[in-house]
Amino acid sequence: NDNLLVVNQLLTNWGLTKSLSLDAGASYNMVKGYEPDRRINNITKAENGYTLLRGNSQQRYFSALDEDDINVKAGLVYRLKDDVEEISNIRLGYTGRFVDDSFKATEYNLTVEHASDFPSLDGFLLDDYYNRDNLSSGWFKIQKNVDKYTVTKNIHSAYAEATYQFTSRWIVNLGLKYDYVDINVDYNVNRGGSEGSNTIRKDYFLPSLNLKYNLNEKHSLRLGASKTY
């Protein structure tokens, strides 16, 4: 296989004031996956040596996967005074993810109709059998099948959360996240048996609650509850 993964990231943090900071970032990820020529050939024992297995047993396969993935984020952090460890803060921000996927697989099934025996595997070349003359003479048949799909995914998220340390033992975190999900899939697979398009456009509101109680310097108890999809 011929595969390629490229990851590019840029992250920054700006201190706007003593209490207010901005976290921002962006990334572009690219995936390329190619299977240029996978071959499957089945040979069986015969009376005079070997022969190509009859039926739809020989195959050539090509596939290509391309994915572009863009991620962005920006968030404000406002630090609160809690007179304990000063870890209390309020966060507001946005994240976005935009993905384009495409996949195409081409499969050639070669059905052997006539095949002569060959005494040894040494020096045997399949190109001597799979050629235009033998195809025209009906020694084998070719069936072509193409499976493909494309996916477009856009997710916009806005969030707000607050963390406050009431005492040296108690820390509370409350949050609310809003996701707008827009996904579209176009597909034609299973030899045309499954063809169509599906779309998801939905809003999600996702609250969360986290409690932490410090028993001592080394041990603590945590309780978390959240909604996901």
Residue ranges and their predicted role:
Residues 2-19, 26-28, 63-73, 79-134, ...:
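Structural signature of Gram-negative outer-membrane beta-barrels, strongest in the C-terminal barrel
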Residues 51-63:
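Outer-membrane beta-barrel pore domains
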Residues 45-47:
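Catalytic phosphate/nucleotide-handling subdomain of diverse soluble enzymes
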Residues 19-22, 34:
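Alpha-helical solenoid repeat scaffolds used for protein-protein interaction
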Residues 39:
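Active-site donor-binding segments of glycosyltransferases and PAPS-dependent sulfotransferases
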